[in-house]
């Protein structure tokens, strides 16, 4: 797919629309955020998932996802040129700086984001969306 008609402002609009559609019922919020420290700790202990504090309490997950998207060197190329409908981004959460008991001994270190996209029959990108995002 060759989609050279999109300009940088249009790419930002796609990103903003994608992040704007994340809400309390979204998979990323509903399944990967925690209301209490004990809930986070329970998931850590029972599922052996070293959960990052960025998905805890009042942390703005939308802002984290947008930051991951904007800092990804592959995002623009994927939007403009790739036939692949899935993009995986894994990045450090060095900006987090928070620590909760639920972490156990695990540092808040990394986040895994999977994006999807819909393409019109004419080959132009219709929208991008978050398939999932979780701490690793």
PLM region descriptions:
Residues 1-31, 35:
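Low-complexity, glycine/serine/proline-rich disordered segments
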Residues 26, 33-136:
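Functional cores of ribonucleases/endoribonucleases
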């Amino acid at each position: 797919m060759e989609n050279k008609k999109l300009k940088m402002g249009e790419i930002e609009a796609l990103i903003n629309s994608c992040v704007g559609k994340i809400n309390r019922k979204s998979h990323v919020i509903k399944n990967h955020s925690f209301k209490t420290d004990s809930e986070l700790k329970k998931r850590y202990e029972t599922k052996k998932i070293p959960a990052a504090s960025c998905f805890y309490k009042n942390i703005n997950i939308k802002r984290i996802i947008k930051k991951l998207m904007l800092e990804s060197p592959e995002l623009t190329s994927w939007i403009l040129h790739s036939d692949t409908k899935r993009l995986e981004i894994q990045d450090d959460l060095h900006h987090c700086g928070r620590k909760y008991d639920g972490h156990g001994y695990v540092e808040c270190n990394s986040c895994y984001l999977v994006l999807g996209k819909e393409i019109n029959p004419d080959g132009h990108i219709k929208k991008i969306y978050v398939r999932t995002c979780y701490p690793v």
